[in-house]
Amino acid sequence: MHHVDETLLARAQSDGPAAVRQDARYAVGTLEQANAIVCICSTLGPLMDGFDIPHLLCIDRTAFEAAVSYGPRIMLVICLASTKDASEQLLHDCIGSNQITPTTEICADAWPTFEAGDTNTFHNMIANDIRQATAQQPFDAVILAQASMLAPLRC
């Protein structure tokens, strides 16, 4: 089952994750019978990390930590500007004291195509932005900050 609570995410983006703590905990609690609950949200992930639920997995941090291990040239790709601060904060937390200065690529023009349901154009636009950025500068790792962005790997 894939579930997105857009109102919860919108409130967390506008008022901060702490403002939705109780509602997020309730939402996750309704899923406690599942074998695993996977959070793929950089905005809500740090909040979810604090919940004492053994089968709640927040994978953004793990993915970002893995990317940092590949080398100092990291590109963070986002397409929704409202996720920029949370994604960059998580990346900086994962970088720690390593000598890494990440680059953020914002594919803002792609997001309206996703909202319109045109995922093919959405994915192609992201893939093109990544190709252009990596043609100008090599990167050791490219982080796609949203799960909806994974298909460009096939483009």
Predicted regions: what they are:
Residues 1-155:
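Non-catalytic structural scaffold of enzyme domains
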